[in-house]
Amino acid sequence: MSESNRPKTNNTRTLDVAPNMGEMVKPAELIEVKGASRLTLADRRLFNVLLRHAFGPDLASENRRFEIAVADLRETHESNDRLVQSIEALMTTVVTIQRPDGSTDRVQLLGWNNLSDPKRKRGNLKYSIPPELALLLKDSTVFAKLELEVLRAFTSKYALALYEAVARRVRLKHVFTERFALDDFRELLGVEPGKLETFGNLNQYAIKPALLEVNALSDFTVTVMPEKTGRRVTGVLIGWGAKDIEGRKAAYAELQRPRVGRKARITGTVEEMLPPEVIE
């Protein structure tokens, strides 16, 4: 994304922005990272919960430790075993983050924690953000506002990734589309290397499910159109726009309904992304 297309925030630091009720603020530096494709939906949800709990000016302080009730992590994990797996995944994942000036840093997503300490305070988890990551976030001025209820409703990590990516762009003035090379778009969605290699499979198992959930549950609409070089799809054009009042009401109503049966309810309410002839 070019500098001219970045959301303008009047140089307000991201960590000084106060989230509204029912939302979290996520620095743009943590939305489109490279190297996170192996993180599951549960891993990504956990990271968002830990980030939301630590969010604020203190997040930029090196070696600052945070404490959260394990019960607050139940929205992402039903068992301690799976929680341990996700904690370890975040600790061992090294991602590449791009700074506003185009330079990059390679950092871990999660630092020290006491989850395995038998003497830790019962029911609580202490953790830290790696100092290199904390330093990088200190001067962040670009962010997305994410609705917590929407984040909790997604059943696909591809939907979560697409929602976050568009949420950081939807506040842009006079910008409603952006082009991505296909490899960059795969990275944005979190598609693992070697999986969904043809565009037909990528469309069927990642793009369409993501569009279905994002368009049904969020307060904006998203389109993804393929772009070809010759007969081969080599990129995509993403488009977005805010929903009208009726569209927002419909999304809110769906969020209040049981998750069971949701796919059947929303299938057919979102236009097909591609004509059949462009599928490989």
Segments predicted by a language model, with ranges:
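Charged, alpha-helix-forming regions
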Residues: 2-280
